[in-house]
């Protein structure tokens, strides 16, 4: 899905998603139901420290969320200019890391 469009309010992995819609749709593909907004995702699963993060954890920031890939990177719907892509997990201050599986 890398390079697919960012669409505010979107939940389509092919036609466009925003950050929380992207995360929600990826996890739904694997049978895991998540709330729709970043703020509601801050309380799902179990909190872990960034040092304990493993691939598949979600990392939440102030108004943003991505899926941890390992090796210090997240996959996420970045913005309308960049679409879905990869960023360093520590590109900004982390609010919480949540383990869902």
For the regions a protein language model found, what residue spans apply to each?
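Aromatic- and glycine-rich peptidoglycan recognition patches
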Residues: 32, 36-50, 63, 69-101
């Amino acid at each position: 899905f890398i390079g697919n469009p960012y669409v505010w309010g979107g939940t389509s992995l092919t036609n466009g998603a925003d950050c929380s819609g992207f995360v929600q749709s990826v996890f739904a593909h694997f049978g895991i139901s998540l709330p729709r907004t970043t703020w509601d995702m801050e309380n799902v699963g179990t909190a872990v420290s960034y040092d304990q993060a493993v691939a598949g954890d979600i990392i939440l920031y102030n108004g943003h969320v991505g899926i941890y890939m390992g090796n210090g990177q997240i996959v996420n719907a970045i913005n309308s200019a960049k679409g879905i892509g990869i960023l360093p997990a520590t590109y900004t201050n982390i609010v919480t890391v949540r383990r869902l599986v």
